[in-house]
């Protein structure tokens, strides 16, 4: 049995939001499945359509950022690229667009579903540590999800950023470090489900990290975990509730 470390009180814990605190990507996956079925492409297989959509999403991120608005744009753009030209009659194409917008609207209307143990764990951790929410995406979308989650009172600050890279992590810890002059970078921890956005860049910025595995993590966030720099820590967990035994 692997012995978990015991971390002293007084840490600053930065929490990711989507697929760390609440379900998120599973709803996008449902929309993608519906999109592929709606497209019913006669040349590309469903797997090939999905790969084309992934390519479009990678492009769209650079111009539209992350979030539902960007995703909707990607669906429509992918539809335009893969639709036969000309596609007749026109009203059929318009109907497809309406269906695609409906897939996105279903995500927007989805109730927030907290992951198991999240509320209770945050409540306990907040008595021993400083908790900060650090999520990327559209500011209005993420702020709305936080408000609907009922978790806002557990966080002393909220950081909604355009991208999570080492420079952003350094900026965030620098801003909050000024509030506690004695707090070192190694007393900051990033906790999340994404190796690409939560773990690797946080380690590169000098933080410790906790990788919280989620089986539905967005494919564009998939990558191998980087080696842990000397003097830093990386903890891997399969359950949010296990945090209380460590922190």
Q: What are these model-predicted stretches?
A:
Residues 40-55, 84-100, 154, 180, ...:
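Short, surface-exposed acidic
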Residues 56-106:
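A metal-dependent, Asp-based hydrolase signature
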Residues 28-37, 72, 76, 80, ...:
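An amphipathic alpha-helix signature
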Residues 1-10, 119, 123, 138-247:
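Asp-based, Mg2+/Mn2+-dependent phosphohydrolase catalytic module
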Residues 89, 94-113, 118-149, 158-164:
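Substrate-recognition element of Asp-dependent hydrolases with the DxDx(T/V) motif
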Residues 2-52:
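Active-site neighborhood of HAD-like aspartate-dependent phosphohydrolases
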């Amino acid at each position: 049995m692997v012995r978990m470390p015991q971390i002293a009180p007084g840490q600053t814990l930065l929490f990711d939001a989507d697929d760390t605190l609440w379900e998120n990507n599973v709803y996008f996956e449902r929309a993608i499945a519906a999109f592929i079925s709606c497209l019913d492409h006669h040349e590309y297989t469903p797997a090939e359509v999905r790969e084309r959509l992934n390519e479009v999403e990678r492009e769209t991120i650079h111009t539209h950022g992350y979030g539902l608005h960007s995703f909707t744009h990607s669906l429509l753009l992918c539809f335009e690229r893969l639709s036969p030209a000309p596609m007749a009659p026109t009203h059929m194409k318009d109907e497809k667009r309406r269906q695609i917008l409906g897939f996105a609207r279903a995500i927007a209307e989805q109730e927030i579903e907290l992951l198991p143990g999240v509320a209770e764990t945050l409540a306990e951790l907040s008595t021993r540590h400083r908790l900060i929410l650090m999520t990327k995406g559209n500011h209005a979308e993420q702020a709305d999800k936080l408000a609907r989650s009922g978790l806002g009172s557990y966080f002393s600050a909220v950081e909604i950023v355009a991208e999570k890279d080492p420079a952003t992590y350094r900026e965030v810890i620098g801003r909050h470090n000024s509030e506690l002059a004695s707090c070192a970078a190694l007393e900051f921890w990033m906790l999340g489900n994404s190796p690409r956005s939560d773990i690797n860049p946080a380690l590169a910025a000098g933080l410790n990290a906790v990788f919280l595995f989620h089986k539905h993590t967005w494919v564009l966030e998939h990558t191998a975990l980087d080696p842990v720099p000397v003097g830093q820590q990386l903890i891997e967990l399969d359950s949010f509730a296990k945090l209380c035994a460590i922190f």
